[in-house]
Amino acid sequence: MLLQDVHHREQLDDDVENAFSKINGTARQASPFADEPSIDVPSTHLPVVTPRSKTANDRTGLAKSLPYASLGASRSTIDEQDVLIQTWAILLHQYAVSDTVAFAIIGKSDPSGYSGRRASTQVVCLPHLFLDSARATPHAPAVHGWDGRLTYAELDQLSNSVARQLLRRGVRKGQFVPFSFEKSIWMVVAIIGILRAGGVVASIDPSQPQSRAREIIQETGATVIVASTAQASVFAGLVDTVVPIADDTVHPAANDTGLHPSLPPVHPEDPAVVIFTSGSTGKPKGIVIQHGAVTTRMVAEGRAFQYHGARTLQFAASTWDIFMTDIFTTLAFNGCVCIPSEEDRRFNLARFCAEYDVSLALITPSLANLLEPTGFPTLKTLIFGGEALKEEVTRKWEAVDGISLHQGYGPAETGPCVAGRLAERPEILGYALDNSVCVLVDPSNPNRLVPLGAVGELVVGGPSLLREYINDPRKTEAAVIENPPWALDLMTPVRRFYRTGDLLRYSVDTLDGRLEFVGRTDDQVKYHGQRIELGEIEHHLSRLPGVEACVVVLAKAGFFKDRLVAVVQAGKSSGGSSYGTQLSLRSDPNITITHMRRFLSSRLPEFMIPNELLVVQELPHNNSMKLDRGRVAKWVADMQSQPSEAVPKPHTRGNELLAHESTARTIAREYARIVAGDSVARRREYEDRDFNLQEGGIDSIQIMSLSMFLTEHFGFQVPMADILSSRATVRSIASLIDANSSPGRGQPLNTQETARLPLRSNGPAPSQQALERNGSRVFLTGASGFLGIEILRQLLARPKTHVYALVRGSSESQARERLVQKAISAGWWQDAYRTRLHVWHGDLTQPQLGLSQLQWQMLQGKASPSIDAIIHNGAKVHYSQDYETLKKTNVSPTVELLKAVHDREEPLHSFVFVSGGQQLSFDDREDEKNAAKSLKGSGYARSKAVSEQIVRRFANQKGSKARHVRIVKPGFIIGDAERGLANQSDFIWRLIAACVELGFYNGDEADSWLFISDITRVAQVILHSVFEDDSQPVTKVLDGLRFKTLWALLQDKFGFELQPLSRREWLARLKHSVATKKEKHVLLREQFPALHHGVVPFNNAAGTVVHREAAESTHRYMTSFPYELGRDDPASAAKTQRLQDRFAELAAFMNADPDEIAFGQSTTFLLRSLGQALKPLLNSDCEIIVSILCHEGSAAAWVALAKDLGIAIKWWAPPPGDDPVLSLDTLRPLLTPKTRLVACNHVSNVVGTIHPIRQVADLVHRIPGAVLVVDGVAWAPHRPIDVKALDVDFYCFSWYKVFGPHVAQLYGRRSAQKRALAGISHFFLSEMPGLDWRLRLGANSFELEEALVPITRYLKRVGWDNIIAQETVLQDVFLAYLRRRPRVFRIFGEQSSDPAKRVPVITFEVIGHSSTVVANKVNQRGRFRVVSGNCWAPRPTHDVLGLGADGLIRVSFVHYNTVAEVQEFCTELDSVLETLNAGI
């Protein structure tokens, strides 16, 4: 029956009116249909609305409903029958009043809109989504953050590097990898890197308490954590490996170069991410989601919300599922992720979005309500999600034209499943997305559907569902429905559904299939977008001492509306039944909000800690004797004013503000308006009072609102560190504002009071007594730091001085070893120092620094031997943490030490405090102003300034217990000229690196003075303050130079091209520079004396210049007394031990063990010796494969061995061409079961090409008994050697190619030695262990081996990433020069500068000219040294490349060469060719 005739309207109107009059009447009796026969509900089918006249713009009507019989009409409840009547009535009314709506009764032929519904699925992985975009738009911006920007190509390179770094550090496919980052572009690099390595991302928010982080680590079983450099130290003791990711730890040049296996294949069914949310059992629950599920979510959301090419605001915390949307949906649709700093995110969001052209944002309604829509001129799409939308929010944003407004819904277990544009009522969410099948079921019986229009629990099916709850199969089973009976009725192939716990219904307002949110089935709530299980809060709160029972509610109305309220019962109940108990308040001084918040802050994230606390006599129970949550929630919601017996807040005890404190009063009133809303009673608690902002109950969203008001009202933005400080009060914030608006007014109270408090107990001291001039026992803090290790060196260099160093560690022995290792790395440690170095295991943050009673008494001069002098150098340098956080490391230990000095009976000789964080000035009159700036500066600057004030006051008080109290104030500190070791993370080096990379510097400040000194000089000043009477109370280290001198130095001496720019233009370029810094230590070349003779070595592949410490070490050895090894006397024992230590360090250089390395005079010698030792493995029936690209020193060893045994060599040749590369495809046909040895080089010394050694090893080791021997001579100067990652059997290289003398090193896998190697040394040495003894022919060149350890330490200090970066630039410049002249030069090998494919060994010939003649002309001019001929590799030169006797020209760089030298060489080469072409 189809109703279309307009003449039926009058009758239908009467029916509608009758129906509505009954619907709106009194409550029905037991049988709702008995008295109302006029309402004829069809017994077989439910109605379906369709358009009367369909136009192109009309949307298809409400999805057709099920046959009523399938719902079990006979089992309909009274409520369901009410719903059916109401639905019919509304449909009739819609038909009656609308020209476009009709309805029909349909049969079973097409019963449901679900028929055959197949959810959209993506069968790709997250990295693939990103890589597809990277291939399509490599140069488009992918990430634009406050700290830099990255294109898709750069993000691809960097994340690839991170992935390979993680593989080297032990990450394996499917392994959970916790991830903790502040907002940064490196956050995106890291998360993609984890996924590309096959890891599963498990985010830990930096703000979460350590206990929660520990729970997540325990749940995931993680052994590796990826973190920002700021967070790395937090996790140091929680897992085996912490991998910091930042601009100075990641470089695209660190791509796969054969050091390790390729990236593992990742499949859609593999886990991608685990999201931890609040759990009702008291610990977070982890939702594991597969790659295919996440990618399906991202694509569905991107299509629904117009993500194509969007510049997306990344606002969500990394622990939210929205975080993945912000990043991967944006990258999948070729957009750009825009990342604000934490301060901009909280307090300057509008400005950031405008400056970064943000066009799309997904935020919570609570946040959107704070923002002013007109402040977002670039915004085109705004999506509300995370919590219920309110009408005032929609009205606010709908008033602005040009912004498309959407609402999204979906728990973390399903991802986005419902979405749509805003409806008239915010409860209407939208339509099911194409990745989801959404069904409403009976909450008490999920196997039963609810009728159309009835409220039901939403269950979601499709490919986007979670895989499981980690380690909790029971919870997974309870949450997921498998093969529900109604799935067949719906005729959908989806068989797995998730129970959301959310109550929804089809909207009867719109009648078009949209879903409407109603409520929850449990006590889970959403609070400012965060999903909270109230049971988890209750679990922890119940453990607060004195709490017998508790209920936590989110108040829906009343005085506490929208607040988390904890209702607790203190003490035992009365003992009787509490069913029907009336709730009544009581006071308990032992349970306060302060106690509660402090207790929970170490257990829960900040957003889960209740704002309010109510203590009651007894909590009620229901008739099942369970806590009656409903009654408690209603009781709280019914409160219309502050209960008289409520727990008093700390702020109510605050002082009243005075009438003249206008700024403070304004702050307090705005605070009251934000927190108390319309409640007059609550406002009175805050207005005109001074109180602690955090303890007043303000939450994270409200603090943003307060900050915006302060900025707008006072024209001054209070720094985030100040407003979020745990000690921030109304008065302290007012003081900051007043100080900014009226210079000269008092500084913030909190820091001034801190400076005064520690000294109040310091009374008068006895008169001073003279002490010995040179204090012989010095206590030193911060000994293991960059400056501290140099102070320690100079102290130990004084033969009568004993040093007592405070060092953190798991034990005293570990602390000692840590400090000694630092000294070894610095290159100055001597074992003789052990008797005068006393390492005290302690911690600056602990009372009395964590020292034992005896040690503390030595500081107090009450135990023998007593400490004579204290150098307080220890502090935590962290520019983003607030003062309160840094106080415990930077202020409290100063107080502790001064208390110890104050308690002395005999005065201390010297107390020296090393300050920092302040601007220096030649004019002492500026010092007070600079100190005042520091007190308003960063948390670090403030903490150092407060400590300095404390020391000054201590020094000025009468009867001081220290003869000398002195302060040393250095500027920037660099490494000394002798060792060239720098703190490369320091600001000054980052500034220089940035300018070098840009090619520009700030010309406006070129005449400004740069206060900079080397560590030797600063340490000397400190020691002078300790030991000399004539030292000043305050010594400013004013050494330095003008910035223009620095820029000139970098240009003239180191070859960097730098040009001045205005400050504004320079800053603009700096902000848009690439994130990967090519940081290099500018004093590095000083380590190589041969570089200062005016000749530039571009013949490095034939032998590098020698590192100074290597030469000096050999000289020291040869001028020392020649004690024999292995004797019983102390001198021999010490020399033997040093030899063993050296072996261990040189083995570690290759990632080998000491018994796996041997030394010889050259690689040729060692490989010949190895060949002799391998003879027992071989016979004439065996086969040897040798690469034709080998250096003859390598190839000749195997040719000779094959000749001796009558074996025919198989030559492994590359495909023909000028770019010869060893291929696995050409190796496979050569391998047979008879293969016993394969030899090749890691890098061709002729063309510089890198060969895939790990893949070669995998192929060779498939043959039982076969060994792989690799010549690494051309690899070793350019890349780290990791024989375990390469999985080779033998590996050899020459140290004279690695900045050392003529000595070579060979690795032999222990198992290969035992299986294949016979000893060739003297018969009486046959039982000696290790490779060196097996191959030793006479004594080693110990004097040359002595030179090697300093080289390994030097390379470690410089860092391989920096070496690769520098060499990549060098080869890029020269290859570009050659490529631009294809008619002049014929290039051999890889023509790109890709560091994954080549090292900077570059060969070419000049077309039409003899290579020998060209090279001779260059060398004769005396400035450059290059090589020509066959480079001791005739087979690749003549047989492969087809060159004649003249061969080729080889130019080879290493990291000490400069760009300027390469450019000069290009000019020189042009000049040489001009003379040759002219016939001169």
Swiss-Prot record:
Stretches for region Disordered: 31-59, 739-773
Official protein name in the record: Nonribosomal peptide synthetase-like enzyme fsqF
Biological or metabolic pathway of the protein: Secondary metabolite biosynthesis
Organism: Aspergillus fumigatus (strain ATCC MYA-4609 / CBS 101355 / FGSC A1100 / Af293)
Region (Aminotransferase domain): 1100-1465
Keyword Phosphoprotein found: yes
Any one Pfam family match given in the protein's UniProt record, by short name: PP-binding
Residues covered by region (Adenylation domain): 132-527
Chain residue ranges for the region called NAD-binding domain: 780-1003
The organism's place on the tree of life at top rank: Eukaryota
